[in-house]
Design a protein with these regions (language model features):
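Helical segment within the ABC ATPase nucleotide-binding domain
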Residues: 166-179
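ABC ATPase "signature
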Residues: 211-212
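Conserved ABC ATPase "signature" region
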Residues: 96, 100-123
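Conserved ABC ATPase signature
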Residues: 127-134
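Conserved ABC transporter NBD signature motif
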Residues: 56-67, 71-72
Length: 249
């Protein structure tokens, strides 16, 4: 489970995220959407314990990420939009490294299945610097799954993937949710978010415009349009926010 309460993040004089609160239950997939600069990546990086929050409470699988970061990080995995791999390690050596870091002893069979699932078996002995952008993304996803985390966060996971890769990635995320993981997916591919996610969080200029179920978002931003797409909801929400700000100013 992920619990975020009254979360703020500032960089010097810049407010990146302001008073954000939300929860992601086990088995849920939350779609985190917003324009560039909305605060999405800052939110994910703070929850993952990569950068500290300015204030607020961030709890991952029952552990406060600030007060108890080691315990929290054992339960989570974060896949950034541009995964940093070790150039001279092979794909299999990356899995071996992650298994050692998380003290996973029975990882080899799981690793083989992950490589097979993501079409990486034939490349298992290839070093990272020789991999395409999409393959590097797949390696990062396999590494994220290896220690069977209770919390998973993805920042633009579709980047670099071909259509088959996108399908495999989407199916694997849905499968992880069915197994009980709490998942956040941040993406500009709104149709993919709509396909995967049961709940939605719209960020705009660091503020939460909406948090709730997808059907509630349709009611809020599209009235009686029960068939409104996430793209329509997104533009109704963000453009409406801009109009309100313009009126107030």
């Amino acid at each position: 489970m992920i619990q975020v309460k009254n979360f703020h993040k500032t960089y010097r004089e810049t407010v990146a995220v302001q008073d954000l609160s939300f929860e992601v239950e086990p088995g849920e997939i939350l779609g985190l959407v917003g324009p560039n600069g909305a605060g999405k990546t800052s939110t994910l990086r703070c929850i993952a314990g990569i950068i500290p929050p300015t204030s607020g409470k961030l709890v991952v699988a029952g552990h406060d990420i600030v007060a108890d970061p080691i315990a929290a990080k054992r339960k989570l995995a974060y896949v950034p939009d541009d995964p940093k791999l070790f150039d001279t390690l092979t794909i299999w050596e990356h899995l071996e490294f992650v298994a050692a870091a998380y003290r996973v002893t029975d990882w080899r069979e799981r690793g083989e299945l992950l490589l097979q699932r993501h079409d990486l078996t034939a490349k298992r002995n290839t070093v990272a610097q020789e991999l395409s952008r999409g393959m590097r993304q797949k390696v990062a996803i396999c590494c994220a799954y290896l220690h069977d985390p209770q919390v998973l966060m993805f920042d633009e996971p579709h980047v670099g993937l071909d259509p088959r890769g996108i399908r495999l990635m989407k199916d694997s995320i849905i499968e992880r949710a069915k197994l009980g993981a709490s998942i956040v997916v941040s993406s500009h591919l709104l149709n993919e978010v709509e396909d995967m996610c049961s709940r939605l969080l719209i960020l705009h200029k660091g503020k939460c415009l909406f948090f709730g179920r997808m059907d509630e978002a349709r009611t809020t931003f599209a009235g009686e349009r029960g068939d409104a797409s996430l793209e329509e909801i997104f533009f109704h929400a963000t453009e409406g926010s801009e109009e309100t700000a313009s009126t107030l100013s």
